[in-house]
């Protein structure tokens, strides 16, 4: 895992098409903005896990 430090307003670039910008920090929460092409799905981890679980259950039926 790559670990980076960024300040509010600073951006990370992933590949040629994805950027992640730190928008704000309030207590222990960090607000980030993600710019990516529409064909790239972006989910919070808990939502992604739920989607995977639902797809897995559908495949069992």
Swiss-Prot record:
The answer, when asked if RNA-binding is one of the entry's keywords, is yes
Single GO cellular component term: cytosol
Q: Which one Pfam family would you cite for this protein?
A: CsrA
One function term, GO molecular function aspect: mRNA 5'-UTR binding
Which GO BP terms apply?
Answer: mRNA catabolic process; negative regulation of translational initiation; positive regulation of translational initiation; regulation of carbohydrate metabolic process
Q: Where in the cell is it found?
A: Cytoplasm
Q: PANTHER family under this entry?
A: CARBON STORAGE REGULATOR
Record note on quaternary structure? Homodimer; the beta-strands of each monomer intercalate to form a hydrophobic core, while the alpha-helices form wings that extend away from the core.
| Known role | A key translational regulator that binds mRNA to regulate translation initiation and/or mRNA stability. Mediates global changes in gene expression, shifting from rapid growth to stress survival by linking envelope stress, the stringent response and the catabolite repression systems. Usually binds in the 5'-UTR; binding at or near the Shine-Dalgarno sequence prevents ribosome-binding, repressing translation, binding elsewhere in the 5'-UTR can activate translation and/or stabilize the mRNA. Its function is antagonized by small RNA(s).
Q: Which family does it belong to?
A: Belongs to the CsrA/RsmA family.
NCBIfam families given in the database record = csrA, PRK01712.1
Please give the name of this protein. Answer: Translational regulator CsrA
What phylogenetic lineage does the species belong to?
A: Bacteria, Pseudomonadati, Pseudomonadota, Gammaproteobacteria, Enterobacterales
What is the primary gene name for this protein?
Answer: csrA
